[in-house]
Amino acid sequence: MLEGSRLLDANPHHISWLKVVEILKDYEFLVLFTSTIAWSGDQRWAEKIRDTYPKLKICFVGPPVTTDPDQALNECHAIDFICRREFDYSVVDFANGKPLDQILGISYRKNGQVVHNPDRPQIEDLDALPWVTDIYKRDLDVTKYNVPFLLHPFVSLYSTRGCPAQCTFCLWPQTLSGHAWRKRSTDDVAAEMSHVKEKWPAVKEFFFDDDTFNIQKARTIELCAKLKPLKLTWSSTSRVTTDYDTLKAMRDAGCRLLIVGFESGDPQILKNIKKGATVERARDFARDCHKLGLTIHGDFILGLPGETKDSIRNTINFAKQLDVETIQVSVAHAFPGTELFEYARVNGFITNGNKMTDDLGHQIAHIEYPGLPADYVMEMVHRFYDEYFFRPKAAWRVVSKAIANGDLKRLYQESRSFLKVRSQRSKMVREARTQKTAEAASA
């Protein structure tokens, strides 16, 4: 981390726009990480900042500017340059005074024209990067972050970058981290964890937010052997292809929970999205985790290529058979830069002008297949949650664990949030039905 720099995450820390402007007066260079969904709003922020500080240098990083840097630079004139894909060393080069035309992996304007410098090679030596936990400790209040299925407070970090899986819908490997799987040494990861345990004793859980944490068995078991003596509680991502021995090593080393992308309970859809996994393997994986006492948070997606009303029902039934502790159900989003986006674009399946959220930030379906209306997919997301969590077994599991852990206050807060979102989702479904009925009547 550059001396004098600062990591600012305004929203969770309730830092107002006026306060952000005040903070920026002490800086010469601003790097903004943007997402596909936040891109329009972030452009407006950048324009306001440019109006306030005309001499401030502004750089954007993230998927939307990586996938179409020409459009980004032409849309937002507040931007001085863009870093494509990994940006760690590009921003350091600029901060250290290197001219734009000598920095790899960036795009910028020169004489009114967009210029794309040669790509920067992917970072191979991840151990050379600074420990993010030191930066978080210095600049962030981790109590401001809450993920319902993780212990509170938690800290997230990475032990690898990239993902060799070819899932057609997944944004990060296709736009930012790449498919080449690169790893930190197990010694470096264990040293950081030991350091944080000593310096940050209030943290209750560490989350490895790797694209695919345990894809290599030997490396995972080696890392677990070094984490086990630290007696930490941690969680990670996982694919269903992970075998029992690896899961056991993780459990013995302090792993508590796995975030798992099951995506669908329909075999053909798993093939369509190049998931590299089967329904049968997913069942075996869930059984192994249950046997070992590992908690699973399962991710599911409705509206993937090949989806039908029957396949949606198959996925809901499949999820209930797996009976994992918590789930997240998303509608399929075709992010620019992904194979799914090209598939949906070429076939004319994208609706709503590719708008993925409403004005309040709630997900909306923007892919519509013949015979599967987008409003039906949204309705089934709503029904999926209800059928899953309002089962007596599922509800009691969540409540009993909160009682055992002394987390009733948190359960109350999260239940209120869940019911609020459920109410908003229900309203969206009703409004879509009403609009459809009105359109049918007018026709």
Protein language model features and the residues they cover:
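Residue-level recognition of beta-strand->loop/alpha-helix junctions
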Residues: 6-14, 174, 212, 238, ...
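Alpha-helical structural signal in soluble globular domains
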Residues: 1, 48-52, 75-78, 97, ...
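Radical SAM [4Fe-4S] cluster-binding motif and immediate context
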Residues: 132-297, 317
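Conserved C-terminal portion of the radical SAM core fold
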Residues: 29-31, 197-209, 231-240, 244, ...
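Radical SAM enzyme core and accessory elements
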Residues: 25-29, 339-342, 349-443
